[in-house]
């Protein structure tokens, strides 16, 4: 039975590496996969998913106005596809997550999403919130803070190296802009969040 999966973490935990490894495992067994990523994430090149360890693969892109059910349906009509893998899933809209759930339920294709749980302010992304509500299975991908504790938060740093508390929720960046921390060190970096 097909399921909707959400593999979540903070930055630099290896989510894209795990996605690419899962795709490779299917391909190695003679099955095709359908990779999706946001059209504005060009860190590995437009229409590519890349990992920090140097592996990458081509992917179809989507905008926040695309109907992901329609994209998956069209891909399945073009030929067999064993699995859909979505990178940077936090950037999907709530409606797009529902479209993925519909693809799982109505088209019978497993969908594996990989993304951040919270942003640099400690708030859920809309796509992540919807996935936490709708996913059949959720898996935490672990990484560590500089202190050795499990990192569950991320800060965005400015050019001066200081943590930022304001700004757009979506800003594509990598190791130079984001640092994964445990909650204690997140609070030390940005201060306590007002209740």
Swiss-Prot record:
Which terms does the record give in the GO molecular function aspect?
A: ATP binding; thymidine kinase activity; zinc ion binding
Q: Name one GO cellular component term.
A: cytosol
Cite the PANTHER family for this sequence. Answer: THYMIDINE KINASE, THYMIDINE KINASE, CYTOSOLIC
Active site per database record: 88 (proton acceptor)
UniProt keyword terms in alphabetical order: ATP-binding, Cytoplasm, DNA synthesis, Kinase, Metal-binding, Nucleotide-binding, Transferase, Zinc
Pfam families on file? TK
Cite the binding residues for Zn(2+): 145, 147, 182, 185
Q: Which GO terms describe its biological process?
A: DNA biosynthetic process; thymidine metabolic process
* Cell membrane in keyword set: no
GN (gene name):
tdk
| Swiss-Prot/TrEMBL catalytic activity | thymidine + ATP = dTMP + ADP + H(+)
Q: What is its EC number?
A: 2.7.1.21
Q: Please indicate which superkingdom the organism of origin belongs to.
A: Bacteria
Which species does this protein come from?
A: Jannaschia sp. (strain CCS1)
User: Which positions are annotated as binding ATP?
Assistant: 9-16, 87-90
State its location(s). Answer: Cytoplasm
Q: What is this protein called?
A: Thymidine kinase
Q: Which family does it belong to?
A: Belongs to the thymidine kinase family.
The annotated subunit structure for this chain is:
Homotetramer.
Q: Cross-referenced PROSITE patterns, in alphabetical order?
A: TK_CELLULAR_TYPE (PS00603)
